[in-house]
């Protein structure tokens, strides 16, 4: 039974033309195992920046955030360490992306309900970074680039996305 489920899941992923396996250069940078580094991966893929460069930049941004604030998030960063390996707060990665020339485009408001899903026909073309529930993912011309298919069969809600105004017409 388990093998049958695994086979069906693998077959579903293999047949999804809207998904491409992409670790953003994580393996090439020498990292192994699993990690909650979706922010690093998504930024590396969408900006075409080496994984290690993004990792180091976010680590530095985490350190600056933790050192310059007295919030719960800053204290949590200090206590768990500044590594972006196991997640990043939006308060850190959004200014990082904005410093690279990227802009935020919300796709829903509080209490509004989902209007845009993680589907090619509902997203702009070009390179974007979509914010989902507890996840960031790079989408390149409608193709989800990630270590797993996070589309939920096109039903996953997109809260908004980052885009580079100089690259595309969003």
List each model region and its residues:
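Short linear interaction motif-like sites in intrinsically disordered regions of transcription factors
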Residues: 2, 20, 103-105
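Acidic, Ala/Val/Gly-enriched low-complexity intrinsically disordered segments
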Residues: 2-4, 11, 137
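Active-site nucleophile-adjacent alpha helix/oxyanion-hole segment immediately C-terminal to the catalytic cysteine
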Residues: 6, 10-74, 95, 100
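N-terminal hydrophobic targeting segments
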Residues: 14, 124-126, 162
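Detector for Asparagine
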Residues: 15-18, 22, 62, 86-88, ...
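Polar low-complexity intrinsically disordered regions enriched in Ser/Thr and small residues
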Residues: 27-28, 90, 157, 163
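Conserved active-site-adjacent core of cysteine acyl-enzyme catalytic domains
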Residues: 65-134, 140-142, 147-149
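Active-site signature of cysteine proteases
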Residues: 134-135, 139-170
């Amino acid at each position: 039974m388990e093998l049958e489920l695994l086979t069906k899941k693998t077959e579903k992923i293999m047949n999804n033309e809207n998904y491409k396996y992409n670790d953003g250069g994580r393996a090439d940078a020498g990292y192994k195992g699993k990690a909650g580094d979706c922010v690093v991966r998504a930024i590396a893929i969408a900006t075409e920046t080496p994984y290690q460069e993004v990792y180091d930049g976010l680590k530095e941004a985490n350190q600056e955030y933790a050192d310059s604030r007295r919030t719960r998030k800053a204290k949590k960063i200090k206590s768990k360490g500044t590594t972006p390996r196991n997640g990043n707060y939006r308060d850190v990665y959004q200014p990082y992306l904005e410093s690279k020339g990227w802009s935020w485009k919300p796709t829903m408001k509080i209490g509004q309900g989902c209007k845009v899903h993680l589907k090619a026909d509902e997203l702009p073309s070009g390179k974007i970074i979509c914010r989902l529930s507890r996840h960031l993912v790079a989408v390149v011309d409608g193709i989800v680039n990630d270590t797993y298919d996070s589309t939920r069969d096109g039903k996953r809600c997109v809260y908004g996305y980052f885009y580079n105004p100089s690259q595309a017409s969003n």
